[in-house]
């Protein structure tokens, strides 16, 4: 029966795959019962095969390999010899698999493994046994380490307090080695005396190696909450802050990483670091060149500065903004750039740090990373740029940044588009060069497309409309920009934004843009066809009613609705209608909406700028005889005559022009008396020539302030939390705005006017047909 024994041994050695047996049975069209193959018995499928999970077996490959294994023939003597070898070495094979350390060196054991990809049963069983053995060994070692540390800690504590520095050094080295093992590390952190001794030794030693070992020990302890608490209670934070002045890099690394762990996870650590002067030390370390060290240091600064104004001011006083900007300009390590941008983002909402960052070149340095593959870095840079942008309207060398921002308007990321639009809005405000640059790189088309894509997302549409408003006034490319908005199909969506659900800040911005677009005669008809005029009148009436209602209730403060004063809406809508009224067809529409009584009433406004725009629109309407008669019929003569004495030359000139146009059908004697009155009023300071009055600010002045961001917001300020214009709409930078000015009386005497001797000169003194250089809707003074 030797042959049978041989085959049994070979069968044990080969360990044929169960799938091979299953496949063999299925080749004979039998169902596998599981007895021969060992396969799990399952109900036969409809196909007549066995386990459905094994239907993908390549039986031909299995049978081919099986046949290959027996391609060599053996004699009975050879089989008996092989059987004997396997029988004698079976115990060694098991021992080699499960307890390899017990074998004699050099012992040769025949393997039963024919295929290296398929381990034998013994090898498979050995894996869990090895894991169990290692677990037992680790447990024994852990217990040994813990017992050793527990016995050694009291003695080591005494040695750390020894007067002999050599002894202290040896003890510090030993404690450092113990802290590398988990069991002894826990024993150390549970001994307050030991932790205090480590802190004291680190703080007082002059030996570099002792400082390195003690700092390394605290670093190892700081990976556990229990260790962090022990360090904190032992006064470790002041000692670690002191070590930030060490000239040894390894000590610096241990100190900053330990402090970083404390700041992240230990309550009270932030205040302790601040009190120990940690901020000043950390800022001083920003001139190091190790990027990973700098990344940890800047992250510590961010943790300390976030939500703490005093920390932000300390960083400023220590020269932090310049150092942080230098990092952004110098390095390429993504994590360092990200942590540094986070610090700058926190500092950028501080009114003191903001100009310092801008002056250090922060705008340009942050702009270098707007095309980085790291989205978290790009987003932080954009947030920071947006916070800084209202303080950077006078910065030079912004061409690259502006071009990148225009490109980012096409991003699919809503946050990126929102930030890019807000930054462009601020940087184009009252900055001639920036306006030119944005127009030259396709900014008008990009902004119009952004508004079209944004739909009702006002956090995008409002800054985009503000940017368009800035770009359509007061620079050489303004007329091109006014045309470009129309050519890129922007007029319909702009007029649509005057309607619900737009909120007042967006409406205010849109009114200003329409006013600037109306400076281009080619836009008059399209704006009229889109229904801009009736909507402007509706908004004007509503805002005026709100102001009148408040006044009748005894209110003295200007009313804010969603951060916008209703007086701003009154002034803005009237100013837009003033420019639109330059077109004869628009004048007919405006007059047909019964607006003249309201415009006359606005002449009595205590706000000088509202007086000016009201007189301006009446001046345009009075070109038509019917309108001039209607203006006179509404009793406009008295307030207009009073406004002749206004300190604002623009108001006085418009009032004079309306009075003159109203007098065209009057007797010659009346005209002469009016002429003398106008001359004495308008030239009361000096006999200025009429052809010079176009520079007196007859058109509407500039408006508002930059799109700022709340200092109490760590990331960014909503456009709706106060609006982009913080001053009264239309405030002229060259004049003081007297909110409580005179109120013209309704019964101001008009008789006894002298001869009107300067009629033609008066008409020459009106604003030019294109007052593009005087456009007012350009925020941020």
UniProtKB/Swiss-Prot annotation:
GO terms for biological process: acinar cell differentiation; adherens junction assembly; anterior/posterior axis specification; apoptotic signaling pathway; astrocyte-dopaminergic neuron signaling; bone resorption; branching involved in blood vessel morphogenesis; branching involved in ureteric bud morphogenesis. ARM repeats lie at residues 151-191, 193-234, 235-276, 277-318, 319-360, 361-389, 400-441, 442-484, 489-530, 531-571, 594-636, 637-666. The modification (Microbial infection) Phosphothreonine is found at residue 556. Changing residue 142 to E: No effect on interaction with BCL9 and BCL9L. Belongs to the beta-catenin family. Residues 34-57, 705-781 are annotated as: Disordered. InterPro entries: ARM-like (IPR011989), ARM-type_fold (IPR016024), Armadillo (IPR000225), Beta-catenin (IPR013284). This is Catenin beta-1. The keyword Ubl conjugation applies. Changing residue 32 to G: In PTR and hepatocellular carcinoma. Changing residue 33 to L: In hepatocellular carcinoma. It is linked to Colorectal cancer: A complex disease characterized by malignant lesions arising from the inner wall of the large intestine (the colon) and the rectum. Genetic alterations are often associated with progression from premalignant lesion (adenoma) to invasive adenocarcinoma. Risk factors for cancer of the colon and rectum include colon polyps, long-standing ulcerative colitis, and genetic family history. The modification S-nitrosocysteine is found at residue 619. The modification N-acetylalanine is found at residue 2. Keywords: Acetylation, Activator, Cell adhesion, Cell junction, Cell membrane, Cell projection, Chromosomal rearrangement, Cytoplasm, Cytoskeleton, Disease variant, Glycoprotein, Host-virus interaction, Intellectual disability, Membrane, Neurogenesis, Nucleus, Phosphoprotein, Repeat, S-nitrosylation, Synapse, Transcription, Transcription regulation, Ubl conjugation, Wnt signaling pathway. It comes from Homo sapiens. Expressed in several hair follicle cell types: basal and peripheral matrix cells, and cells of the outer and inner root sheaths. Expressed in colon. Present in cortical neurons (at protein level). Expressed in breast cancer tissues (at protein level). Residues 734-745 have a biased composition (Basic and acidic residues). Residues 772-781 are annotated as: Interaction with SCRIB.
């Amino acid at each position: 029966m030797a042959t049978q024994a041989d085959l049994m041994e070979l069968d044990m050695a080969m360990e044929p795959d169960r799938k091979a047996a299953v496949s063999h049975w299925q080749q004979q069209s039998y169902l596998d019962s599981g007895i021969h193959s060992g396969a799990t018995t399952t109900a036969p499928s409809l196909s007549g095969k066995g386990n459905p999970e094994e239907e993908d077996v390549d039986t031909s490959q299995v049978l081919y390999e099986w046949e290959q294994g027996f391609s060599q023939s053996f004699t009975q003597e050879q089989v008996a010899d092989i059987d004997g070898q396997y029988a004698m070495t079976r115990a060694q094979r098991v021992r080699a698999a499960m307890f390899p350390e017990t074998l004699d060196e050099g012992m040769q054991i025949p393997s039963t493994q024919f295929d290296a990809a398929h381990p034998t049963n013994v090898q498979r069983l050995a894996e869990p046994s090895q894991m169990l053995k290692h677990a037992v060994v680790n447990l024994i070692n852990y217990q040994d380490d813990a017992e050793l540390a527990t016995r050694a800690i009291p003695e080591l504590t005494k040695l750390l307090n020894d007067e002999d520095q050599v002894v202290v050094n040896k003890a510090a080295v030993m404690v450092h080695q113990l802290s590398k093992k988990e069991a002894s590390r826990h024993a150390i952190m549970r001994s307050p005396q030991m932790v205090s001794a480590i802190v004291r030794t680190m703080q007082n030693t002059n030996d570099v190696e002792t400082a390195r070992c003690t700092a390394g020990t605290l670093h190892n302890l700081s990976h556990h909450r229990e260790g962090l608490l022990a360090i904190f209670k032992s006064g470790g934070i002041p000692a670690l802050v002191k070590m930030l002045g060490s000239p040894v890099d390894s000590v610096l690394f241990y100190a900053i990483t330990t402090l970083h762990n404390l700041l992240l996870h230990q309550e009270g650590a932030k205040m302790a670091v601040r009190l120990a002067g940690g901020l000043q030390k950390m800022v001083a370390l920003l001139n190091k060149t190790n990027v990973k060290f700098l990344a940890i240091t800047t992250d510590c600064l961010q943790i300390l500065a976030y939500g703490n104004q005093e920390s932000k001011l300390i960083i400023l006083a220590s020269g932090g903004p310049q150092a942080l900007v230098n990092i952004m300009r110098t390095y390429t390590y993504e994590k360092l750039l990200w942590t540094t941008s986070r610090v700058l983002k926190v500092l950028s909402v501080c009114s003191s740090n903001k100009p310092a960052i801008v002056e250090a070149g922060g705008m340009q340095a942050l702009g270098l990373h707007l095309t980085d593959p790291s989205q978290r870095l790009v987003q932080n840079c954009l947030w920071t740029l947006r916070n800084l942008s209202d303080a950077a309207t006078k910065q030079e060398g912004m061409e690259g940044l502006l071009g990148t921002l225009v490109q980012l308007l096409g991003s699919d990321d809503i946050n990126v588009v929102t930030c890019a639009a807000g930054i462009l809005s601020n940087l184009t405000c009252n900055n001639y060069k920036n306006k030119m640059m944005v127009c030259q790189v396709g900014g008008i088309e990009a902004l119009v497309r952004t508004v079209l894509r944004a739909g009702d997302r006002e956090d995008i549409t409002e800054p985009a409309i503000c940017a368009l408003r800035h770009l359509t006034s007061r620079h050489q490319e303004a007329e091109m920009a006014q045309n470009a908005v129309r050519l890129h199909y922007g007029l319909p969506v702009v007029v649509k934004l005057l309607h619900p659900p737009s909120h007042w800040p967006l409406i205010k911005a849109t009114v200003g843009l329409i006013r600037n677009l109306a400076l281009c005669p080619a836009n008059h008809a399209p704006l009229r066809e889109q229904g801009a005029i009736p909507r402007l009148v509706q908004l004007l009436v509503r805002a005026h009613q709100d102001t009148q209602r408040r006044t009748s209730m005894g209110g003295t403060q200007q009313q804010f609705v969603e951060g916008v004063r209703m007086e701003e809406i009154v002034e803005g809508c009237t100013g837009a209608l003033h420019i639109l009224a330059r077109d004869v067809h628009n004048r007919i529409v405006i007059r047909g909406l019964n607006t003249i009584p309201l415009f006359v009433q606005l002449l009595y406004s205590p706000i000088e700028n509202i007086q000016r725009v009201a007189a301006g629109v009446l001046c345009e309407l009075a070109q038509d005889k019917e309108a001039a008669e209607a203006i006179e019929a509404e009793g406009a003569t008295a307030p207009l005559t009073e406004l002749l004495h206004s300190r604002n030359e623009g108001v006085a000139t418009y009032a004079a022009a309306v009075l003159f146009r109203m007098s065209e059908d009057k007797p010659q004697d009346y005209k002469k008396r009016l002429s003398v009155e106008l001359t004495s009023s308008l030239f009361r300071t000096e006999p200025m020539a009429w052809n010079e009055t176009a520079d007196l600010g007859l058109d509407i002045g500039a408006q508002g302030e930059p799109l700022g961001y709340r200092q109490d917001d760590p990331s960014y300020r909503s456009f709706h939390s106060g609006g982009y214009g913080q001053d009264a709409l239309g405030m002229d930078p060259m004049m003081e705005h007297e909110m409580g000015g005179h109120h013209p009386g309704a019964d101001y005497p008009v008789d006894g006017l002298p001869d009107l001797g300067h009629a033609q000169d008066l008409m020459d003194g009106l604003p030019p047909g294109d007052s593009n250089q005087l456009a007012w809707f350009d925020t941020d003074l």
